[in-house]
Amino acid sequence: MQVQRHPKQRLCKLMLAVSAAVMIDIAGAQLAFAETTPTATTAPMQCPTEATPRYTKTPTGYLMVLRTGDNAFKELTKLAIAEKIPSASITGIGFGNVKFGFWNKDKKDFDAKLLNGVEMASITGSVAWKNDQPSIHMHGVAGDATFQAYGGHILDFEVTTGSMEITVIVHQRRLERGIDPCIGANVLGI
């Protein structure tokens, strides 16, 4: 005796079978693609020189890799000018000497503190323009060898041991930075 199945039950089984076949077909196509796609080969790592490229193009902007002795602000400025970046958002990590600033509203200037040999756990900021020159604005969090963390506005950053990696996401519109007369500080205009 054969058990009669409900039509919805048969339809569900059919849909499962079709879904499984499609998934197997997609997986097979991906595997075939992976087997035929050439893999990137990289040259052996060498010590950087002045001629060593500091950035490469990505689908959304650029990836920078700075090395010992590089100044993050100088390299970002060079990139913005060379690639005619209208504006951008930046994120990064790295190791080096950082000068943090804390805005003193009474002085309308930064109180600065230099930290040497720290690990930048996070860097975030923007690239805009002021007086036809790139204006880089970065904040970050740094940790030292005792695992103490410090953070704030980054006034300067020089890479020491290791490297600094910065992702630059380019925006289509040129943004300008200017002095806000109410607070006396640079502010991004949108």
Positions of the model-derived regions?
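N-terminal secretory signal peptides that target proteins for export/translocation
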Residues: 1-10
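C-terminal segment of classical bacterial N-terminal signal peptides
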Residues: 21-31
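N-terminal intrinsically disordered, cationic/polar leader segments
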Residues: 35-63, 67-70, 74-83, 87-91, ...
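Sec-dependent N-terminal signal peptides
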Residues: 10-22
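Short hydrophobic transmembrane-like helices used for membrane targeting/insertion
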Residues: 3, 15, 24-26
